């Protein structure tokens, strides 16, 4: 993968993680708020970030390995958000896995973050799989 693509993907990835700094979960705004960083600090989130960084920045003999690891990383962030959406409240508030509780206890910022993460998945595939300006794929060079 060329340096320009690596840089674009890295900047886009960091920008896509910014909504996690907002309060995404809680019982009531101003009383009980939990930032979206819990999405990154669970095992799925940590592994997803590592896969993205390795996939984009570590050179592999077969370029498809790097592309696949990077794709797993951005998809893993979405999976991490969905996982936390369904489970964060189970041990601390409700004691049960409930779709209704998950919806009721998620702030609008969660949905903003999820949409931004989904946009990052789309961006990743557009940037990685598109051909260069010369009409030559990266692997053809």
Predicted regions and their residues:
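Hydrophobic alpha-helical transmembrane segments
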Residues: 42-57, 114-118
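Alpha-helical membrane-associated segments of multi-pass integral membrane proteins
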Residues: 5, 9-12, 16, 95-131
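Alpha-helical transmembrane segments of multi-pass integral membrane proteins
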Residues: 11-22, 76-83, 116
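Short, Lys/Arg-enriched N-terminal segments with co-localized hydrophobic residues
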Residues: 1-2, 56
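Interfacial non-cytosolic loop connecting adjacent transmembrane helices
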Residues: 26-41, 82-112
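Loop-to-transmembrane helix junctions at the membrane interface
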Residues: 55-88
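N-terminal signal-anchor transmembrane alpha-helix
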Residues: 2-36, 43-46
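Cytosolic juxtamembrane helix at the C-terminal end of the final transmembrane segment
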Residues: 60-65, 119-141
